[in-house]
Amino acid sequence: MADSEGTESGDGTEAAERAGGWFLVEAVVDRTTGYQVSSDEEDNSIDTGEDLVDFIDTRRPGDGQEVPLALFVQQNAQDDAATVQALKRKYTCSPASSTCVSLVDSELSPRLDAIRIHRGQDRARRRLFEQDSGYGHTQVEIGASESQVPGDAQHEGGGESVQEAEEERGGGDGEAEATGNQETQAQEQAADILEVFKVSNLKAKLLYKFKDLFGLAFGELVRNFKSDKSICGDWVICAFGVYHAVAEAVKTLIQPICVYAHIQIQTCQWGMVILMLVRYKCGKSRETVAHSMGKLLNIPERQMLIEPPKIRSAPCALYWYRTAMGNASEVYGETPEWIVRQTVVGHAMQEAQFSLSMLVQWAYDNDITDESVLAYEYALLGNEDPNAAAFLASNCQAKYIKDAITMCKHYRRAEQAKMTMAQWITHRGRKVADTGDWKAIVKYLRYQQVEFVPFISALKLFLKGVPKKSCMVFYGPSDTGKSLFCMSLLNFLGGAVISYVNSSSHFWLSPLADTKVGLLDDATYQCWQYIDTYLRTVLDGNAISIDRKHRNLTQLKCPPLMITTNINPLEDPTFKYLHSRIVVFQFLHKCPLNSNGDPVYTLNNENWKSFFRRSWARIEGSDQQEEEEEEDEDGVTSRPFRCVPGEITRPL
């Protein structure tokens, strides 16, 4: 080996050859600066600076050693950078990884950790406490399964060093792997729970689960509504998979929308299950209930069973009554009457037997003579009237309705036959409000060029039923308001209509037997021929014989009769025998209409009442008018009709 520049011969050369020749000179320390002094140095030696001369690079450029030295420095720098990077990857991790999550966020405050926007996958590690999101263990597992699926793929590439570091901290005892297996099983179980609500026969599974939880079938508590549009006030609702916090809050949230609520809550592997009996403030359909409860409970509508309760089932009422007494139910509001009626002893003993006389009295007071109207209106009183409730519980409703209408007609017919025409007009006027104007009728007669005084005179004889004067004929072209005028008067007087189309029947005149006034509308030439042949006695106002179905011939005095026609019988000599039996008024002008198509002159019951009261002195006399005024001041003094037996208090 050649002598290196700056290297002295002797011991230094041997030392350089022994070390491999990588250093140039071996320095000998004679004296150091600073506060510490080596023990092998002499205190009195003088520092000449000769040891610093050897550190100066005095070699010549171009000797071939620049490139190896630069390469050596570069390789050392790369090795140092790789070592530092490995240490960073080993001991420094992402803020979202489980090893760097703050204990305040993950362990001490799980609810604060639950609202984080970006969350990574938590590695399995030893924990002092189980995580609690505030929504129950089932919902935590479901949420974890949904959030951990993308986390696995996210940490595949860069999570190896983190895993190694955690295994080193865990001591390598395999506990992390066991905990990870448990979380994997929980994720699979949560995925199975979510798949339960996606099956095709979901309703069957819900019904099975309901019976498993509550111990009875859902169909034993409810009655089925096929239509989702049917309205009902009481509903039984069973909701599955509800959040724990929502299940507790629904006890308060449902109170503003209902008057009664019975809530039971059960827990299963599907989550919270809520059974409710709710009475809303107004009737709702199943579609409306499902929509509102779906928003309130934050679950899909298909996860609910909604049907109305069995209100006439004693076991069903007893179930709600007994469960309401336990501590497993939350009850709000007043208990429905159908539960009280079937469970409380006092109400059960107060159930009354059905009384037909009360039904007849109700129909008479409300002036109902139609069977369908009576059946419907009386059934609506089932929740208020005990007799109506007993009527609904009876198996002979059709028979009761028919008998009640028959008796009501008998009472009405006898009451009507007992009254004179003046009393009947007064009786009909009591049912009409005092808001009419008689001038509308007078203006209409003046518009049709009918003199008022002759009309009042004819109307007076007509209402009294004077022979030969009890038939008024209104003649004129079409659209002149003849039928409008006569129908309005007939409606106020409560009369009946007969039609010539039924003249082939023996019973077409039978409506005249139960009325005070009759009307034959739109009589044609054939009708006048029939009247001239068979009904001359009817126009006279004398007693006639009427054939009524399933009864013997009835003899009675024919009531006053009004006839409308387009033919003037006074101009036809064929009907000369009818001229003395009828009074004819001509309506020659078309009935005026306003922009809405309504008649300009209003002919209603209120106006007719005002008309009769105004012209009562000319029609009936001053005595009847004074009697009418006394009734207006003092009220009706006669007792109302009563067909219900009174209660007699008997002494002991």
Curated annotation (Swiss-Prot):
Residue spans of biased composition, Acidic residues class: 623-635
Keywords: ATP-binding, DNA replication, DNA-binding, Early protein, Helicase, Host nucleus, Hydrolase, Isomerase, Isopeptide bond, Nucleotide-binding, Phosphoprotein, Ubl conjugation
Region spans: DNA-binding region: 185-351
Single Gene Ontology MF annotation: DNA helicase activity
InterPro entries, per the entry: Helicase_SF3_DNA-vir (IPR014015), P-loop_NTPase (IPR027417), PPV_DNA_helicase_E1_C (IPR001177), PPV_DNA_helicase_E1_N (IPR014000), PPV_E1_DBD (IPR046832), PPV_E1_DBD_sf (IPR046935), Rep_E1_papillomaV (IPR016393), Znf_lg_T-Ag_D1_dom_sf (IPR037102)
Annotated ATP binding sites: 476-483
Compartments it resides in: Host nucleus
Any one GO BP annotation for this protein: DNA replication
Motif residue range(s): Nuclear localization signal: 88-90
Domain SF3 helicase: 450-600
Gene Ontology cellular-component terms listed: host cell nucleus
Motif (Nuclear export signal): 108-117
Modified residue annotations for Phosphoserine: 94, 98, 109
EC nos: 5.6.2.4
PROSITE patterns: SF3_HELICASE_1
Catalytic activity: Couples ATP hydrolysis with the unwinding of duplex DNA by translocating in the 3'-5' direction; ATP + H2O = ADP + phosphate + H(+)
Posttranslational modification: Phosphorylated.
Stretch list, region Disordered: 145-185, 620-652
Cross-link Glycyl lysine isopeptide (Lys-Gly) (interchain with G-Cter in SUMO) residue location(s): 557
Stated family: Belongs to the papillomaviridae E1 protein family.
Protein known as: Replication protein E1
Organism annotation: Human papillomavirus type 61
Source species taxonomy: Viruses, Monodnaviria, Shotokuvirae, Cossaviricota, Papovaviricetes
Gene name linked to the record: E1
